[in-house]
Structures are given as C-alpha cells and as structure tokens.
Amino acid sequence: MNVIHKIGVILFLLCPYISLYGQEGKDTLMFRIVSYNVENLFDSRHDTLKNDYEFLPDATRHWNYSKYRKKLDNIARVIIATGGWTPPALVALCEVENDSVMRDLTRYSALREADYRYVMTQSPDKRGIDVALLYQRNLFKLLSYQSLPVDKPRKNSRPTRDILHVNGLLLNRDTHDVLVAHFPSRSGGARESEPYRLLAARKVKHAIDSLYTIRRHPQIVLLGDFNDYPENKSVKEVLEAAAPSTLQDSLRPQKLYHLLAGKA
C-alpha cells in the first residue's frame, strides 16, 4: 500500500481547523502537522519476545548499525524538509520498533536541534512495530496519552497495533486531541484482511464519539497509515470521512474530513 503510507500529510481533521484553508482570524493558530510511515524503523539488536529477526545483522537483509544510522538520518531530513523554515509542531510516525529507536531519532539525528519529545504505544504486534507522536514542547503541552487496543475478529487472530490517543494544549490554550493509527495491512488480500481494518476503524470511531461527549468543542486530528483508500468501508462507512470543501463555510463541526479524498 505504498501509495498511501509514504505520504506524509494530515489525513483527517475535524472543524474548527479553518485556518488550514488559508484564512486567519485573531484567534487562529497556524502550525504544521505531519504523518509519516517510516517503514520498518528497526535497530540492529534483538528485541526480546518480538519477531524482529529479519532486521538483525545475520538475516537476509544484513541489517546493521550503519544501515540503521543512515535510515535515522534520512527520516530526520524528511521531517525537517516538511517543516519549511521551522520543524513541524507534531509528527505522527508509523512502524517504529521501540523506545530505543525513538530516543536515537530525537537525540542523535538531525532532529536533536528541534528538541522533540515523544510518546508511543507498546502494542502486542508480533513484529514489535508501534506508532508514536513527536511533539515540540514550546508548541504543544502534553497533558495525557493512552494506548487503545484493537479487538481481534477471532480469538486466534493475530494481534495488531494499538491506537495512540494524545491530549494536549496548544499555545492558545485550546485542548487538542491527536489519534495516531496504523490499521492492519492488506496481507493475504484486501477483502480477506478487511475485517481487521474495520475493527480498527470502529475503535477509532468510538474514541472520537467519546470525545464528542466530554468536549464542548472537540478539536481532533486523526493521523496514520490506514491501508485503505477514501472509498473503502473503513474510511467511508465506519469513520464517515468526507472530502473537504475548499470553502470554509461548508465545513461542519463534528464531521470527519479526509484530506486526500478526491486528490488521487
């Protein structure tokens, strides 16, 4: 699903992010958010109880510290480039192995000058890949975060990645909720694997609906790799995500918009 998950952009948003469409009012806060599937960010050491053997020095990929360092540097350069003159305020990452690779990325790559902090999931995924969120503390004050486990369609089904829910404050003191998701892949066929993605989408939808009940004016962004297109059931029917209009007056509160819909 390379067409989808190599694109580093915001995939979903809810009003009132009108400022992203070009008009700024006195209370508007402009900041950049990036979603990026880094594709197998593994270090070269074995992570106990995880199936990461493909990314060890003696495996078929001959993965080693030098290759790992180069990948970190490449990821850092991409993130910096997306920010223009300033690094993005928030960066959602998919397919990161563990805390170790996140520490290396934030402290020992070109990102170290950006002073990012991060939170991530610790999912039961057998390969050990997770999702994470980088944030700049001067732009986003972390209040809380949690992992949301995704149900399995059958008891013997393979576990998948948790969904990351992060809550924080922007500079204008608005509460901001970020959900980072990496839906199950299409391995084995799109139709055969679809039930897994539908369950993940329902988990996200439940989390969003819950935020509607506790926030008067929820400001929610959903980021990640959904392994589906805008017209697929997980996006169109479960999440009910629509293509955004270029006219800000037509955007509705408590409505989910897919920023890539109609752009393929």
Where are the predicted features?
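Bacterial Sec-dependent N-terminal signal peptides
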Residues: 1-28
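N-terminal, active-site-proximal structural segment of metallo-dependent hydrolase catalytic domains
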Residues: 20-115, 119-131, 201
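Loop/turn elements at helix/coil->beta-strand transitions in domains of secreted/extracellular proteins
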Residues: 29-32, 86-90, 113-116, 172-176, ...
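Active-site metal-binding loops of divalent metal-dependent hydrolases
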Residues: 38, 96, 183, 225-226
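Active-site His/acidic residue clusters
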Residues: 49-52, 178-196
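Sec-exported extracytoplasmic/periplasmic mature domains
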Residues: 80-87, 98-111, 139, 206-216, ...
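Structured beta-strand-rich core segments of catalytic domains in phosphoester-bond hydrolases
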Residues: 96-176, 181-184
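Metal-dependent phosphoesterases centered on the DNase I-like endonuclease/exonuclease/phosphatase
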Residues: 197-264
